[in-house]
Amino acid sequence: MKYIGLFTALTLFFSVNSFAQKTEEIKVWGNCGMCKKTIEAAAIKAGAKTANWNKDSKVLNVEFKEKKTDMQKIQQAIANAGYDTQDIAATAEAYGNLAECCQYPRKGAEKK
């Protein structure tokens, strides 16, 4: 009987934790494999659990816990790394620090 209670408690614990995850997509401009590594690393450093950027579609899929971070922080970290997102543009200085192969035609968000 105590095993049923323990099993129920563990099931409830893990199901509640899984609901705390949020998955979002954002547009991030970039060009190459080096961009992919930098963009994904910036998102992870900002608290994303997973980050996967598609260089063809320019879409970053991120999974994160809302208690740990939010999309604003993730996008700001990516912009600080030199990449424009759909809502936050990188500064001219951050963009200028990108390798030549990573400098894309800037069509992203307006500077905020």
Model-derived features with residue positions:
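Bacterial Sec-dependent N-terminal signal peptides
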Residues: M1-T23
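Axial heme c-ligation environment in periplasmic c-type cytochrome domains
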Residues: L60-E63, T91, Y95
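Charged, low-complexity intrinsically disordered tails and linkers
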Residues: Y3, I26-N31
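Short amphipathic alpha-helices in soluble, non-transmembrane regions
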Residues: I39-A41, K73-A81
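Short, low-order "capping/linker" segments at domain edges
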Residues: G96-K112
